[in-house]
Amino acid sequence: MHQQAATSSRCQGWSPRYQGWSPRFQGWSPRFHGWNPRFRGWNPHCRGWSPCFQGWSPRCQTFPPKINRISSNYPTCDGQEQPAYFTDNFCKPCGVVLQHESERISHFESEIHAQNVKFFFQMHGEQSEVPGRKVNMHAGNSQVCSSGEVNRNNFTDLHNMSFDSLAAAPSHYVGKSHSPTQNQSLEEHDQVSPSTCSPKMDEPNTTPAPPPFLKSVIVKPPPAYRMRTYVCHICSITFTSLHMFRSHMQGTEHQIKRAQHLWTHWQCTQLLESHVINQVKNSKKMQESCQAECGDDIKMKKSRELEPKGHFREMEDNYMEAQAHEYREMVDSRPRHKMLEQTLPLENFWAHPGPYNDSRALEEQLPHNLPAESKTYDSFQDELEDYIKGQKARGLDPNTSFRRMSESYRYRDQRYRERVDSEHRQRPCEERFSFEAPQTYQQEYSASPVEGQSPHWLPSHSKRRNDDFQNEFDDYNKVQESRESEPKTSFRRMDSSFETHNYEEMVDRRSSHTMFEEGLPCETFQTYTDPYSSAQAVENTLPHCLPAYENQPSLDAESHYQLTTEEFSEMPASLSLSQQEDNPSSYNVDYDIYKHLPSNDNASAHETSHRRRRQKRKRHLEEGKERPEKEQSKHKRKRSYQDKDLDKDKLIKQSKREEDKAGVSSEKTKHRRKKRKHETSSEKEERKHKKEKKKSVEERTEEEILWDESILGF
């Protein structure tokens, strides 16, 4: 047998070329799909163990020794048989159900099954010996020495190989397949604990040694239980063998992806560095800007002769001291402001209300932790009493009404302007009067509540707070009655043309009244107080932005009187008979006016009468122009009416013939005619109104337009 094994070593897979196992068969014979029956292999014909060849049959659940197959029918060392781990339909170590014979053969010949079986028996501590197989214990060529060590010349544990010749063992150890597997086994041996790697040598080995195809130095679990993996994180690929992992690391795809990964990593680092550099630069700029702002603030404080505050901690420490200092300055300035208020007139004080309001605002903005203002009050009444006492102690009037001051200021300003205007008008009037009877006029003006008020020269009603419109309206009526002028009860807006017309009449009456006043004594002036009061009331309604033209009405009136007299002298002395017949009432009215007026006021009477005559003449001339137009329109209407009557007769005749058909049409035509009549009449009326408006606009002369522009501003 040994000679046959030596001569036919090729059938075991050993190749002289590769100095080891053939890569094709790895120890298997291509003819019998397993071991050669002549060289301790498998018998393809016999089921089970063949007595001739001392091997397993591939049909009867026999397994090749290369992948560590174990039969289920071999006895243990005690002579007792193990339970059937492997049946025709089930594999217990792998947990697989096998239904067909082809499945059983392919499963039992697989490497996964061999590893699972090996791990299964090693975990349970079960070792067995092939029946009928005896190990020779010779010293020269025995597999196991007396000391228990394995002879490397006859058997290798890494590949589970047995050598029949002495020359085959060194050629195998020097070959390429043994060294990488040995390195891998050493790496895995370092990871496993020594208790599981080497058996205990102190205890005697009662069981016989296992066959060479079942021995292993390192306990390695199968892939089903544990599998060593190698991962490439760049390419995200896993490998089960170290050789494939190393070949992948040296490949071109891995190198390209690695270069891309390094490039992206370098870009990220560059971006981070640039971001950090920009942040540092911005922080430096912010520091410089803050320092510049602090320097500007310190310079400004020095220019204002204040202590510069460069640090925020010092500002926080000195905040209370600065607030207290401002409060003291405000308290010291308030009595001085009170003295100025009493000495200066009210108009100047109201024009500059800033310091007092600023001091009050500062007092309100002060913190409440000052010693003078740190009191707590149980009710509002106590706080109000304390406030009144403090104001009286400072020499100020306590403000007990907490309404908004803007409304009261507006009301005071309006009343004060009215008072000043009335005062300016009364003084020149008093200078014109003679001193023969001054008592009557002193009583008249002393009755008015404008003068003699304290301390701001305002009437008592201006100090009230008008809570609603009714109280304000009552006060207004009282003031107007005290001034002997009719109160204005209608507050609707009037047209601009009407206002300008009233103002022109008012100015004319004032100029005539002043001339009449200079000629008459003071006793007769009392009978003509109504025009003066009405002119004064109207002038109060005018805006106060015309001070430059208040001193020129007398000069403008005299120049206007001279121009009108020249025009009057140039006008024709007599009118035509038709015009005199048309307007006899106008001359009668003018004659009555001359009768009632005295001889000293002839100039003003001529002026007013001349204006009225001129306006009436223009109206009559325009009416004379309109008369032929009206007559023509009347003739046209008569003709249209005659034509319409003829049309009506025709329509009546046609309606008698066709009553049923033309009844509706006749009614429609009647309605259309009525609409046409109304439309023609409305158009004529609109034309008349437009002409009248144009004439009223053209009536104003250039002098009146200049007068309006100079006095009224439009």
Curated annotation (Swiss-Prot):
GO CC annotations on file: nucleus
Any GO molecular function: DNA binding
One Pfam family named in its UniProt record: zf-met
Zinc finger (Matrin-type): 89-119, 230-254
SMART domains on file: ZnF_C2H2 (SM00355), ZnF_U1 (SM00451)
Basic residues bias: start-end ranges: 609-619, 669-678
Polar residues bias (residue ranges): 437-446, 575-588
Region span, Disordered: 172-214, 417-469, 571-714
Positions with biased composition (Basic and acidic residues): 417-434, 620-632, 640-662
Keywords, comma-separated and alphabetical: DNA-binding, Metal-binding, Nucleus, Repeat, Zinc, Zinc-finger
Localization (cell): Nucleus
InterPro entries linked to this entry: Matrin/U1-like-C_Znf_C2H2, Znf_C2H2_sf, Znf_C2H2_type
PANTHER family listed in its UniProt record: LYSINE-RICH COILED-COIL PROTEIN 1, ZINC FINGER MATRIN-TYPE PROTEIN 1
Name of the protein in its database record: Zinc finger matrin-type protein 1
Gene: Zmat1
